[in-house]
Every structure is written in C-alpha cells, then in structure tokens.
C-alpha cells in the first residue's frame, strides 16, 4: 500500500511514511506507538529508563549528600562536581522518569505541554552537565598548568564557573520555547527533545542544529582537548625532570588514564546527538529508522550514571568518603587509599611551571 503525504503537526512529527493521511489519529500524545516498534523494544526501553532513573538519582544524591557530610570534600575544585551532580539529578528525575512512564505506556501520556517542559528541563540539565565537563577541564588546566602564574583558585572563581554552565545552558535550551526550533517527542515518541527532524519550515531547525553543534559540542570539546592536552604535556615534562620520582611517574600514569576516560565519556555522551543532528540537516527529507533516532537520547541520559562514576568514583578521596557514608563510617578500602590520594593530589598540583 502506497504511503500518503503527512500533514504537518505543530506538536509532533513522525519522520517515516505512514499508510494514512490522518496522522492526528496516531498522535504520540493519544495512542500507543505500536506502529513504530514491537512490544519488546518498548519493554527494553522501559527497563533501561527505570535503571537510569534509579541509578542516576541514587548516585547523584549520594554525591551531593557525601559532599555536605564531609568537609574535606568541600574544596573549591569540587564545586563543579556538585554542579554536575545537580544537573544529572535534573535529567534523571525529570527526563528518565518521564521516559520510563511513557515507554511503559508506549506513548507520551503527559500531553504536549508536559512534553515541552520535559524537553526543556532535560535539555537544560544535559547542557549544564556538558558545560560542567569543560569547566572541570579548564579549572584543572588553570590550577595545574598555571598559565597565569601563581594563580590562587578561590571559591568565587568556582562559583563563577558553575554560574557560567547554567548561563550557557539556558542560552542553548530556551530558544525552542520561543520559536527557534521546538520541543517534540523524539525517536519512539516516548521522550521529548529539540526537533532534529523537520527542515525548511518556520522553526528554522537547521540553523538551531548548527548553533548547538558549534556552541554546545564543538566549542566545549575544543576546550576539553586543549586543557587536557596541556595538562598531559605539563605532567610529562615534570615526569622527565623527576625521572627518579616514583610518585610523579605514578601521577602521570593515573592522570593520563583519567584524561582518556573523561574525553571518551564526553564523546560517548554527545557525539551520537551531534552526528545524528548533522545527518538529518545534510540529508533533508530522508526517512530513517526511528529506533536509531532513540539512541542519542539514551546515551545522553545514560551519562547521569557513568559521568559520576568517571568524575567522582575515580577520585580516590571522594570514593573513600562515599564508602564510609554507605558503610556507616567504615571504608572497606581502609585509610591508606585516602592518604595516597592526598599525596598524589599534592604531587600533581605542584608540577606546573613556575612563573
């Protein structure tokens, strides 16, 4: 049966040919989207989103509580990690939970207004998380590489860094609320995000996608690569100068490993969205498998779980305090880990060039 042209809808868009000219009857706000996938794929996504909701909420609440509980964790450089936890919490409690309920029902049961709210909040949280990763890199470059001499990193600088992540995130996430792009159901139509699909219409989605690619992917990724590249260069120079120092050699290996993991974590989270959005812009009008359109959203929401693992659990001092909190004051790793962490942090922080 030949597919018919689709009518344009203000609140949703299904980018595949359908055997009906009454697309309103298949609205993702009204009926289960069984025409897009079998019950198995919806059940898999339901379980996955439930895992992200429980895991993301638990680990980020634990990060915040642990920081409040232990004074030693309330250093200026850790402010941005708490900021990251707050943004992740926003995504997991709003984005992942809403997606879980919707996948369970196989359509977005909350309606078009809630879709716009969920899309905005999840995008805002995701953007804050994204910018937090670049601020983490910038702050470490500032403290370790000392590009401005013996710069003293204070609480004011940390707060400014956190505030900038929210400012940039609002700059990127609010335009769809005012007509530059729009928030609609994406992928299997059970979660909402910016409109990556439609082209050549009043929403100017192509220009918005290019704006996001440059401002929210290209620029932060450049900052991360530059800062971590400089950091590794500084550590390698220090390691050569102190070839007999086992602690310096160990610090270099540990930081190199962490940098690689951090860069890969950023790419895993945001490269699928960036690639998918660009593909849509440069292949206008082509249909695609909606299950593939769901993948970028899955990766970005999954970052609420794996980013804390990278940035918090790979921090030995943070991990030690977290284990003490979980095990009622007794860390199963003992106190040696915390001591070695302090020693290593001191070693790494002092390798920058003198000005």
Swiss-Prot record:
The color pigments are found in the cone photoreceptor cells. Its main location: membrane. Residues 334-355 are annotated as: Disordered. The modification N6-(retinylidene)lysine is found at residue 301. Glycans are attached at residues 22, 205. Belongs to the G-protein coupled receptor 1 family. Opsin subfamily. Visual pigments are the light-absorbing molecules that mediate vision. They consist of an apoprotein, opsin, covalently linked to cis-retinal. This is Blue-sensitive opsin. The gene is B23.
